[in-house]
Curated annotation (Swiss-Prot):
<dbReference type="Pfam" id="PF03701">
    <property type="entry name" value="UPF0181"/>
</dbReference>
<protein>
    <recommendedName>
        <fullName>UPF0181 protein PM0480</fullName>
    </recommendedName>
</protein>
<comment type="similarity">
    <text>Belongs to the UPF0181 family.</text>
</comment>
<dbReference type="InterPro" id="IPR005371">
    <property type="entry name" value="UPF0181"/>
</dbReference>
Length: 54
């Protein structure tokens, strides 16, 4: 599930991801769904960054 786009997160980015996952779970989403959702968001952000630097 992890890929290069997710492995290079700063500590701050990791903390934000954890908080987002916890928020989604508090709203009723399962842990697996929340993790997948946040991972997809991170991949999309990374892809946008890569596209703007190309």
């Amino acid at each position: 599930m992890l890929d290069n786009a997710l492995l290079g997160l700063t500590h701050e980015q990791q903390q934000e991801a954890v908080e987002k996952i916890q928020q989604l779970m508090a709203e009723g989403m399962s842990s697996g769904e929340a993790i997948a959702f946040v991972a997809q968001e991170l991949r999309q952000k990374q892809q946008k960054l890569n596209n703007t630097h190309s």
